[in-house]
A protein has these predicted regions:
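Short, Lys/Arg-rich N-terminal segment immediately upstream of the first membrane anchor
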Residues: 1, 145-147, 178-179
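Cross-kingdom Sec-pathway N-terminal secretion signals
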Residues: 1-73, 92-93
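Boundary regions of SH3-family modules and the immediately adjacent low-complexity/disordered segments
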Residues: 24-55, 106-146
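SH3/SH3-like (including bacterial SH3b) beta-barrel domains
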Residues: 72-86
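Short, mixed charged/polar active-site loops
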Residues: 113-115, 160-163
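Juxtamembrane/start-of-transmembrane alpha-helix segments at the extracytoplasmic/lumenal side
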Residues: 145-160
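C-terminal membrane-anchoring or membrane-association module
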Residues: 163-179
């Protein structure tokens, strides 16, 4: 009886649970998740090199495959690995061919992981070599973006402080006139 009651409460809770509380749903007005800074920097730097999906890799993720997920092609190490089975590789995109000729596919979501790259030439990632030139470019761009964000934050703080100071001066002048 207690198990049945607990199951009913659990089902009712899941049915009533607001969409915004679930990680896989973006509610209206909610800011959607964004890729990691490194992933976004890679996409920006290599936007002209992105290609369409190659049908030769359609079955790359068919059987149970231990798959390495990467922040970007050429990264020093994979973000994590997971077992993928029957995932439609042709839904990956955009794609990228690295300097070693390996074919990469991008996905916004795969089994709880967001914004990752998969090397379709070698899903396990055993033969994937890090590309120091790519790493250097991506890290430099991430640093530039972080510096720009910091500068914007400092500028906003200075502007707010200036508005507060001007408002304080005006209030003090108004008080002196009223006396």
């Amino acid at each position: 009886m207690k198990k049945r009651l607990l199951a009913c409460i659990l089902l009712l809770t899941l049915a009533v649970l607001p969409a915004a509380a679930r990680a896989d749903v973006v509610a209206p007005g909610q800011k959607p998740p964004e890729p990691a800074e490194e992933t976004a920097a890679f996409a920006e730097l290599y936007a002209d090199d992105l290609v369409d999906f190659d049908p030769a890799y359609t079955d790359a993720l068919e059987g149970p495959v231990e798959t390495a997920l990467w922040l970007y092609p050429g990264a020093a190490e994979p973000l994590r690995t997971l077992t993928v089975e029957g995932y439609p590789a042709n839904e990956l995109g955009p794609c990228y061919v690295d300097s070693a000729g390996q074919f990469w596919g991008y996905t916004g979501y795969i089994y709880g992981n967001r914004f990752v790259w998969i090397c379709l030439s070698d899903p396990t990632g055993t033969s994937v070599e890090s590309d120091q030139a790519v790493i250097d470019r991506v890290e430099t761009r991430v640093t530039e973006l972080e510096t720009a964000q910091r500068t914007q934050l400092i500028l906003a703080a200075v502007l707010v402080a200036a508005v507060v100071a001007v408002t304080l001066v005006l209030i003090l002048k108004l008080r002196r006139r009223m006396r």
